[in-house]
Amino acid sequence: MNRLVGIAIGRLQKKYGDFKALEIASKIGADAVDFSLLINNDYRSSDSVYSKGKDAIAEYYSKLKEKADSLGIVINQTHGRITGFKNIKSQDEALVKNTELDCFATAVLGAKTCVVHNASSIFLGPNPDPQLMHKLSFDYFSQIIPFAKENNIKIATETFGDAVKYSACDFFGDFDEFVKAYKAIKDIDEFKDNFTICVDTGHSNKAIRYNNPTPANVIRRLGEDVTVLHLNDNDSITDQHKIPMTGMIDWDDIFDALDEIGYNGVYNMELNLSHFGDNFMIETAEFAIKVMRNMLLNRYGE
């Protein structure tokens, strides 16, 4: 089995631009990338390509796809919106519109999945109304999954941890609430084929403080619905997005769980590449790629 190593390049895109970030990813040895669609992508901004219509979006992202292909880089997934619905009508409507364009850009890039965040306690408080949270979740995903279907991609909902502003578990960091929200959409025939899960190991690791499963057991319990990853490590308290094996996560158990569910996707990392400073991001990313390759080599011998 050819196991691909990927890395999220949002920070590189912000510092160096989209095209240069792809070149850097290739140079440091990545097989694949998680491509950010968040940087200056808002249809309400005249400076954004999203404000110029789908022809302009297609032209721009087609060139990026050509660049990635020429470098031998797989754009496996994109990162879309990170706020979820806030129960603020104007902002929620804008979120849907921008997600529609994210789905279109994802397809143009040749990626299979666009990762998004659900509604969060970060914006709605430490003890939000459960009915409201599930309504916001259902309303968001039921409105955006048709765009995924139209573009032949999938929307991935990302696992959560704590709500850092409040020293509380994020509402959908509670595993049972996450599953309930996921199933509410997944059980609908017209949505099920275009909805999936991204496990963020660091987020799930922070949720264990609130009696939630370990990241490995999150993977086991979600099973084959896990199709994309944000692999990162932390101390279980802070959302550090550290390189695997530099925090407290049991990585042998993570790989055991991935094997048990038959995971065959990209081993994609989402890291704080600025941990050692913005001037050291490339070196940090390169080391992370080497670490993941060595982990895979030691485990699988390939």
Regions found by a protein language model. Give the residues of each.
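Short glycine-enriched, charge-decorated loop/helix-capping segments at active-site entrances
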Residues: 47-54, 91-92, 130-131, 241-246
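Active-site acidic/histidine proton-transfer and metal-coordination neighborhood
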Residues: 69-70, 85-199, 206
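Aromatic/hydrophobic pocket-lining residues that form π-stacking "cages" and hydrophobic walls in ligand
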Residues: 21, 64, 102, 144, ...
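Histidine-acidic metal/acid-base catalytic patches
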Residues: 1-6, 11-31, 69, 96, ...
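Glycine-rich, proline-tolerant flexible connector loops at the mouths of alpha/beta enzymes
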Residues: 34-63
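Active-site-proximal loop/turn and secondary-structure-junction residues that shape catalytic pockets
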Residues: 11-13, 37-39, 81-84, 120-122, ...
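N-terminal small/glycine-rich loop or linker at the start of catalytic domains
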Residues: 1-9, 76-86, 120-125
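Short beta-strand segments at enzyme active-site cores
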Residues: 33-35, 75-80, 112-119, 153-159, ...
